[in-house]
Amino acid sequence: MTLLTRRALASIVLLAIAGFAQPVRLTPQPQKSRTFYALADPQVPPSLREPPAALPIGDTTAMASASDGAIWYGTAQGLVRVDGKADPRDRCQYFAGHRYLPDDGVQQLVPDLSSGMWVRTRTGVSHIELRSMTLEDKTEIFENRIRQRHDRHGLVAPSNLVTAGDPATNQTRDDDNDGLWTSMYAAAECFRYAVTKSPEALARARRSTEAVLFLEEVAGKRGFPARSYIGKGEPLPRDGQWHWTPDGRYYWKGDTSSDEIVGHLFLYGVAADLLPDQALKKRIAETTTRIVDHILDHGYYLIDVTGKPTTWGRWSQDYFRQNPPDSPLNSLELLSFLKTAAHITGNQRYEKEYRNVAIELGYAQIATRYLDIRGEINYSDEELAMLAFYGLFRYEKDEDRLNRFYRPALDAWWANIVREHSPLWMCIYATGEPRAKLNFDTAARTLYRMPIDTIDWTVKNSHRQDVVFDQEVDRFEHRQAKTLLPRDELPVAKWNSNPFVVDGGNDGRSEDDGAAFLLPYWMGRYHKFLLGK
């Protein structure tokens, strides 16, 4: 009996005894912010300028009790807050690196009157505040940041900071996965509109959905989306395969990955279902038709302008005969493309091809083999799988097919994903396994602990005594932990990153867009896994 078969049987037993997913009622929670000051700044408490008092032990350099009763400890390697009354997951919190401190050498602490702390270090002062806010309040911070610094022709992606750590020096740039990141942001805005009916959400959803649609149009409207593009006069990129449009107005990037097709089709299904604009829905259906026809007409390959398949756009039986470890994922992707296209367009060609691919060609069975042939854990593949699962579980109504193939396949991926406490993957898992016993308090806790500051500061945790390391490195040879640290103590990351790599960052030379927070929040609100604001 294979491991996957055992997982499937265990899942059946679990579902027989489990209740439904447990939604969580959201409440305002303290969110961290910090402001740096020079020691001589008049806003700094005068007592912080006094010589620090010596403590009887060497490891602790300062100690203070905050107005809420929490005890803060300064050390030569950062700051620790201990609150015995807090949820066990939040009882001990670590502050280090430029996300929180001018440097990690804490010398003196002075509490403010609102549960926060003034912190003097070797090189400056940080005022760390704990501001009570709802998750919806938090979304507004991310939304404003995206509008101000991460919108390039409607595409949403990370940006560079010319001066490290200074958002005023922000420069948007093209990204290999502009289509995927923008699709995830646009989908978040679609869910936001469905929940709130906000005109602003509708406008943002339209703008970014149109930007994703244009990626296919700029490359010639032949069903081959560009990875990214720039306009004439913008700085020319130095990497990848780029092509000018015939009119010389745009320069677009080729060698498009399966990542982009997954992202586009995920968005198109969500937008077609949730947005009211009939003209936009027509464009979505036409673009979906061209993309899926391109894949079908080229034998399940994505064919570049070179006439050859792209590096990762391969879903054919010939490719699968080589027994690549990504065949379960790629099978899942193609099935999701076809099912989503059938739903969006109503074209029976795609439904007929879907059934042929699923059963006659055996792709549904191949999709269940993930644990049998997985060579390594690839967190980018997890992202692609879960986005593909969303379309399948949303549009597939055949319970036999769901129970025989797709739910066992989902459980195989979930075996590792469950460790990550990702609210996005929890939402998608719950749509596929509605009887599974999931507590969305875990999802909410991750959202609460995602940092508001998305600058890619250098973060180091490998020295910590509370981190237990795995003996195996990850696929990039990075040391990884068994301990899952809170997101606001980790390097800034998207959902395709390994959350068990505890060191990282680039000294504040870039800023993430923050859409990784918006999509699970609004998806959770839409599906009523997250109740309230």
Where are the regions that the model predicts?
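Conserved beta-propeller blade signature
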Residues: A70-Y73, G116-V119
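Well-ordered alpha-helical scaffold segments within catalytic/enzyme domains
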Residues: S183-S198, G248, G263-L280, N330-N347, ...
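Extended ligand-binding groove/face enriched in aromatic
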Residues: R152-D166, D175, L202-D326
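Short coil-to-beta transitions that initiate beta-strands within beta-rich domains
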Residues: P23-S67, Q93-L113
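Long, well-ordered core segments of solenoidal/helical folds
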Residues: D137-P167, R204-K221, E286-V305, R349-Y370, ...
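Terminal, non-catalytic domain-edge segments
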Residues: L130-R149, A385-K533
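Short loop/turn segments that connect beta-strands within beta-propeller blades
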Residues: D83-P88, R131
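Loop/turn residues immediately N-terminal
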Residues: A76-V80, T123-S126
